[in-house]
Design a protein with these regions (language model features):
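Hydrophobic h-region of N-terminal signal peptides that target proteins for export
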Residues: 14-22
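Soluble FAD-dependent oxygen oxidases
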Residues: 2-6, 21-566
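Classical eukaryotic N-terminal signal peptides for Sec-dependent ER targeting/secretion
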Residues: 1-15
């Protein structure tokens, strides 16, 4: 822990900042400023966290300077990247395209800038490490970033000229049959550190005969940004959103205080942490999730090919007409449509998760849709697998390492019910306009809708939605800056107006998988909850220590979170 002199120095600076905080004139300290911490102070911080302070570098620099060059398998491995403090899954979030000149570090580059990567990282192993890091950032007026694994589609886990707190080493997993919340028995649960990836967590739960609601990406951290954004799952139609099933958080807030947060203790912050946006509330060090008895399930993967965009659109209209067929089965499904440029065709891959039924029953459930869809395309692959659900949702790794941005919308159940043919027109228009992939997620309805009574920061649109649809936009390292800008803006400029035909306007989106340039993020990500979230933000983070792209309070700061603009 820090000594008395270090802590007194922090306190004096904090008191000064509290007096001098003056809106638009207020900026964070950056290298070159007279008040930027000296090497001696960084060394003191390193001693205080037992030598766990490291310099953060972009992943390309890590590979060239520290690893002797990364293989293709390493570069595209999310598990590999999670171990690199400065790495993000999508490499574009490590770049600073906007500065003049830009600060960029690309794979195999001989000239690397720091980009959007933090200056230093604390590889925290204890709550005390986190508290010291937050206190140091506050005392020295530094930009602060928090990263669990780097599985982040809006660049919220990294920040230029910042100090990063990495929770990757919080690998604790504790199961309890009778978890207590403020003395009350909340039932079977698991407490998970904010560094535990899902592939580890699901297998640990299997050993206990348990399952919990979470995603299917191997390196997503259940207790990280995933749960703060709400957390959808292939099990959501059966069991609800992840945020519907969280019982407690352990969090370090902006004043370096460690809190247990639940329905009875700091209930306002508990409300905000369940859907109020990733990275805005503090450093979560653990979360406790309700668990359920594990069960057998059938997973299926069906692949179809369509010759052109009209045929693909017809398949998707057919899918929309059949989507309620599976309600009684509580089926979750990922339906991904994409262009196959090598075959000059369009593909649809449907990965379905059927709880507690056999493969024959699952095949029978899909058959009416597939029979109708074959009028417009060809089935080129079909697999059914009976398995334990923990194995069904476990993946080994995630393929990453590209330059990719997203845009998304929640699609109301009423649109599927009343206008299923419109889905065909929308898919055709999107691909005709140059879309590369449209990723559908049947992760709403069922228990998600039934849980509308739960008072949390989840956008109310989740309770009336049927699906969550994402568009992806990517580019090569060789792409010009002007073209990168066009691609980054493609969702709002050309794709969203088409998608709104089924999403409505103003629509809603899942804030973890969305466009960081969303113009009205308050409405789109948070809806009527935003005023209450803003009030809670002022209460727990009055100085804006935890500012992220399109997060609560971010409109009061510039794009880098370095200077106030209000």
């Amino acid at each position: 822990m820090a000594g008395p002199t270090f802590l007194l120095e922090q306190l004096s600076v904090v008191l000064f900042l509290c007096v001098s905080f003056t809106g638009a004139n207020y900026c964070r300290t950056v290298p070159g400023d007279p008040s930027f911490p000296s090497a001696e102070k960084w060394n003191s911080l390193n001693s205080s966290v037992s030598g766990r302070l490291v310099k953060a570098v972009p992943s390309a620099q890590f590979c060239s300077n520290m690893h002797g060059g990364c293989t293709d398998a390493e570069w595209t491995s999310a598990s590999f990247r999670a171990d690199i403090p400065g790495a993000m899954d999508q490499v574009n979030w490590e770049q600073d395209y906007e500065s003049v000149p830009p600060s960029i570090c690309l794979r195999n580059s001989t000239d690397c800038g720091q980009g959007n990567v933090p200056l230093y990282a604390i590889l925290a192993e204890s709550v005390e490490d986190v508290q010291i890091g937050v206190a140091f950032s506050s005392a020295h007026n530094l930009r602060l970033a928090v990263k669990a694994s780097g599985h982040d589609y809006l660049g919220r886990s990294t920040a230029r000229n910042s100090l990063l707190i990495s929770t990757h080493k919080f690998q604790n997993i504790t199961f309890a049959e009778n978890f207590t919340v403020s003395g009350h028995n909340a039932g079977s649960a698991v407490t998970v550190g904010s560094g535990v990836p899902l592939n580890t967590l699901y297998q640990a739960a299997k050993e206990q005969g348990k399952i919990l609601v979470s995603g299917v990406a191997a390196t997503v951290v259940a207790a990280g940004g995933y749960i703060q954004g709400g957390g959808h799952s292939a099990l959501s139609p059966l069991l609800g959103l992840a945020a519907d099933n969280v019982l407690e958080f352990e969090v370090v807030t902006a004043n370096s205080t460690y809190l247990k947060v639940n329905e009875e203790e700091h209930a306002d912050l508990f409300w905000a942490l369940r859907g109020g946006g990733a990275g805005s509330w503090g450093v979560v060090v653990s979360a406790t999730f309700r668990t359920f008895p594990t069960f057998n399930a059938t997973t299926s993967l069906v692949s179809m090919v369509a010759n052109d965009t009209v045929a693909l659109g017809s398949i998707m209209a057919t899918h929309a007409k059949h989507i309620f067929d599976w309600d009684d089965l509580s089926m979750g499904q990922y339906f991904y449509a994409y262009e196959n440029t090598t075959a000059d065709a369009y593909m649809l891959a449907l990965a379905s998760y059927f709880p507690r039924i056999s493969s024959d029953e699952a095949a029978a459930a899909l058959k009416p849709f597939l029979d109708d869809a074959e009028q417009f395309g060809q089935i080129v692959g079909q697999q059914f697998n009976e398995t334990n659900i923990n194995d069904g949702v476990t993946t080994v790794d995630d393929v990453v390492g590209s330059n990719t941005v997203l845009g998304s919308r929640l699609i109301p159940a009423s649109t599927y019910r009343d206008h299923p043919d419109t889905f065909g027109h929308v898919y055709t228009q999107l691909f005709d306009a140059g879309a590369v992939a449209v990723l559908g997620h049947l992760v709403a309805g069922g228990k998600v809708s039934e849980n509308a009574y739960i008072d949390s920061a989840i956008h109310p649109a989740w309770r009336t939605a049927k699906t969550h649809i994402i568009l992806t936009n990517s580019w090569a390292d060789s792409t010009s800056l002007s073209n990168i800008s066009s691609i980054q803006n493609a969702f709002k400029d050309s794709q969203l107006p088409i998608l709104e035909q089924i999403a409505g306007s103003p629509g809603a989106a899942y804030s973890n998988e969305a466009d960081s340039l969303e113009e009205d993020f308050k409405t789109t990500f948070f809806g009527p909850n935003y005023p209450r979230l803003e009030d809670i933000k002022r209460r727990y983070d009055p100085k804006g220590m935890f500012i992220v792209a399109a997060g609560v309070g971010s409109d009061k700061w510039d794009r880098d979170g370095l200077c106030r603009v209000d």
